[in-house]
Amino acid sequence: MADTGPHTTNSRILIVVCVLIAIWLLLPLFIIVPISFSGENSFSFPPKTWTLARYASLANPVWISALVNSLTIAVVVAILSSVLGTLAAFGIVRSHSKLMALVRAMILSPQVVPIVVFGLGLYLVFLRWNLVGTFWGFVIAHTVLAVPFVVIPVSAALQTLDRSLERASASLGAGPIATFRQITLPIIRPAVLSGAFLAFLSSFDEVVLALFIQSPSFYTLPVQLYRNMTDTIDPTVAAVATLQLSLVIAAVVIALILQSRRPDTNQI
């Protein structure tokens, strides 16, 4: 006989509430999708006519350059953040120094400090280093923001790691590098990869900091999107927003899948 007690009823109510909240939060995002196919010269919903002209406009070199810059920067940032964030997580978790709490706070501070304050300070520093409007300027700035997205999940994975596996590997003659490659890395890999995806998203979608360090000759997709929204109301931005939304959804789904695929340490 099916359970129809109060707990089941409460669970169903919670599910309905969660679904309604999710719809309320996501509906404004997905309204952009049909607008991107609108044949109108202004934002209108629902569209009266349908066309792919907005997506054809993305062949403009301005949009292509912005997209290539964003993707290239985001990939480099994801790689650098994965390496630096993993090393930082090892130092934070494995070190017994009392200073590690301060180090952790410093690493995570870019996520706490108002982005405008951080961007202004970074802009003044980059002016002296001639990094404003450069590829590596964007990479450095975005990496600072993205490293915490790797440190947090990798630290959590290391804290739950069974250290006896590493000690057993060492007792069998494996060196630190071999132990890390064959024992530690396979266990924390889902955390590293999910952190890398979040770092990629952080860089690809970042606009406030990019506005401080961009130049007329080097800019990212969010910056170009902001320019179009402030200079002229161009419906092409709906197509760009849909493209960004698709990439973000794909990356989030992949990150969630990787995060859920934690290897069983009993099988190692």
Regions found by a protein language model. Give the residues of each.
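Generic hydrophobic transmembrane alpha-helix motif, especially the helices
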Residues: R104-F138, F149, P190-L193
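C-terminal transmembrane helix and the adjacent membrane-cytosol boundary/short C-terminal tail
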Residues: A2-V16, L99, S155-E166, A170, ...
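Hydrophobic alpha-helical transmembrane segments of multipass integral membrane proteins
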Residues: I23, I64, V68, T72-L84, ...
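Transmembrane alpha-helices
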Residues: V17, A22-L29, T143-V144, V151-S155, ...
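N-terminal, non-cleaved signal-anchor transmembrane helix
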Residues: M1-I64, V68, T72, I254, ...
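Interhelical loop and adjacent transmembrane-helix boundary motif
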Residues: T4-S11, E40-S42, Y55-V62, F204-I254
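A structural signal for multi-pass alpha-helical bundles of membrane permease subunits
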Residues: L27-E40, N69, G119-W129, F197-S203, ...
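Transmembrane-helix boundary motif in ABC transporter permease subunits
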Residues: A2-H7, V75-I107, L124, F180, ...
